[in-house]
Structure formats: C-alpha cells, structure tokens
C-alpha cells in the first residue's frame, strides 16, 4: 500500500516453498542488488510484484524505469520490485493488487479469469509476427481491454510488455503435428483460453502457476509445458525437458496494472511521470526481447534442447474444426472479435 514502508525482501522471501525456494532464493539475491534499491525517505512507497525471474528482461527494464521515476520525482516516488513470486503466485498477486495490498502487478493470462476479453490478443495463431501484435495492443484492441480492466478497480498502463510467442517443450516426444499432442499431459497457465485451446487439440491440460512448473516437470506430473523462449531459458526448463517444438501458437504479453485507489493517492504530476516512464520501459523491453530471441535458440540448443520447426496450418485447421474459434468469438463478443480481425485477418 502506498505511503507505507514496503516489506523487506528478506521477510517476503521466507514465504516461498518447495522448488520455489531454489528459484526464488536466487531471484531474491539478484533482487537485493539489482531490484531492491530504494530511497531512504520517499513520500510515496509502492510495492510492485511479478512472477518472473529477476534476470528476465521485464525485471531489468522495470528496475531501470523505477530508478528513472525516483530520479524524475526527486525521490518522492519509490517503487520496490519483488520478482520471482516473492509475494505469492500470479493468482495471489492479482488478488493482492485488487485489494490494495499490492500497488502494481505485471499480469498476463490470469487476468482473463476476471476480464475474459484481456485474453483476446492471445487467440491461437492470430498473429504471424510482432508487427500485427503491436498494432493491435497499441491500438483499438488494447484500448478496449484497458477500458475493461478499469471496471475492476485497476488501472492498466498504455503499453504492454512482451512475453513473446509461446513454444511447446516436452520430455517424451517432439510435436510435429496435432496428433502428437493427443494425450499429452501439458502444463498451461491458469487461463480458460489456454485450457480450451489445448483441450481442443486433444491434450490433457493442467493449469499450474508458473512458480510451480519446474517441479511439476521434474516430478513428471506433466510431460511438457509451453512458454516463450526467454522464460524457458530463465526458468531453466531445459534441465527437465528434451524437445522444443517451435509452434508459435500464441503471443502473450503482460499488462502493468495498478490498484486505482492506491495509485490515485499520488498527485497527478507524479502519476503521469510514473506512467510515462513505465511505458517507455515497456517499449525498450520489447526491443530487448526481439534482440534476445535471435540468440536464444542457439543458446538453448547448447544447453541440451532439441528443436524442430512446425507447420502451423494443420494446428489452425484442427482448432477451426473443433469449434475453438467459433466458441471464443461468442465469448468475446462481436465487437471485440471484429476489432481483433481488423489486425489479424479472418480467423473464423
């Protein structure tokens, strides 16, 4: 909550459990030096949490933006970052930011449990590249989503942060066509859209919070998972997976959201400065991800993953035949769907 001294990173870290102890401890150590800088006597202290490793490009650019905010406001606004699920899983933090216990949160697919239309940019195979993605989320589609986010007591900042196109990793077989997905135990985020898509393709999807995925893969609770290459690398999934199939089945990004009641305690000029600098950080992070994606495949091959390129058309046809697109067109509504197709082209 704003204007209260944030809980120390050390105290928060003691709440992590299981495999989280390994990943979060590493993140907390990095967070202490990279993300934990704070002013001694700021007028407004804000807590910002996310479930991403401290080394992820989002956390690096967020830390830079928070430093810039502190400087631009002459130390009046101090945002302390808690990466790596130090404040709980994504579902927990979404509840916290709604209640005001957390001030700012970078939220991805779990937002769809409250605002279903927030998942629409992630419709399977909607965008072949980033040009279409940024045109949509920086344009009318993003504006529509931000307006909906405002109905649950949150403020969504203008620029989405990039998570990337998602790829499938498995421990038992590569995925070359839809038949290879039949019966696969696949971890998916806590999101109805993801569960619906992979069920339509014949998998056995299991919704698991990100911080628990490594353990689920290690103990064979699931055979595989799907995430962008940056997260596959940062979370070290290559240690417990053998194959990476470049399906590029969904793009996903993160909204930077703030508790409206808390955020409006800041004077307008400080709010505008905070939003402007965090938006700038988002745009820089998009460029970071584009650069990183050029080298990640080579790096992950060196770490033991075997890659295969996938023809996406059979997957799209299978989803269309299963009624996936028609189902979600009905759920999102005609206005939102037509807005999406202005950027993606016809999907259903």
Question: What do the PLM-derived regions correspond to, one by one?
Answer:
Residues 2, 21-132, 140-141, 147-348:
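N-terminal secretory/targeting leader peptides
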Residues 1-17:
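N-terminal secretory signal peptides
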């Amino acid at each position: 909550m704003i204007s209260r001294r944030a809980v120390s990173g050390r105290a928060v870290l003691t709440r992590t459990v299981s495999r989280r102890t390994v990943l979060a401890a590493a993140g907390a150590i990095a967070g202490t030096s990279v993300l934990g800088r704070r002013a001694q006597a700021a007028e407004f202290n804000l807590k910002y949490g996310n479930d991403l490793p401290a080394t992820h490009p989002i956390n690096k650019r967020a830390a830079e933006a928070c430093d810039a905010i502190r400087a631009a406001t002459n130390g009046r606004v101090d945002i302390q970052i808690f990466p790596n699920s130090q404040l709980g899983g994504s579902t927990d933090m979404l509840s916290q930011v709604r209640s005001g216990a957390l001030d700012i949160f970078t939220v991805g697919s779990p937002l769809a449990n409250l605002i279903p239309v927030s998942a629409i940019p992630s419709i399977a195979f909607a965008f072949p590249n980033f040009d279409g993605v940024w045109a949509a989320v920086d344009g009318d589609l993003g504006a529509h989503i931000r307006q909906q986010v405002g109905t649950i007591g949150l403020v969504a900042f203008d620029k989405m942060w990039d998570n990337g196109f998602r790829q499938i990793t498995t421990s038992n077989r590569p995925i070359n066509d839809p038949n290879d997905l039949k019966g696969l135990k696949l971890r998916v985020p806590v999101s109805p859209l993801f569960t619906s898509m992979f069920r339509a393709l014949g998998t056995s999807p299991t919704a698991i919070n990100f911080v628990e995925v490594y353990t689920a893969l290690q103990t064979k609770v699931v055979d595989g998972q799907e995430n962008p290459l940056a997260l596959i690398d940062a979370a070290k999934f290559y240690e417990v997976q053998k194959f990476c199939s470049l399906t590029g089945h969904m793009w996903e990004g993160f909204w930077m959201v703030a508790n409206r009641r808390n955020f409006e305690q800041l004077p307008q000029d400080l709010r505008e400065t905070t939003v402007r600098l965090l938006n700038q950080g988002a745009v820089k992070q998009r460029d970071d991800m584009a650069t990183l994606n050029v080298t990640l495949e080579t790096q992950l091959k060196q770490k033991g993953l075997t890659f295969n390129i996938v023809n996406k058309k059979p997957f799209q046809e299978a989803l269309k035949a299963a009624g996936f697109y028609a189902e979600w067109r009905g759920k999102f509504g005609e206005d939102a769907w037509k807005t999406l197709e202005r950027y993606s082209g016809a999907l259903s």
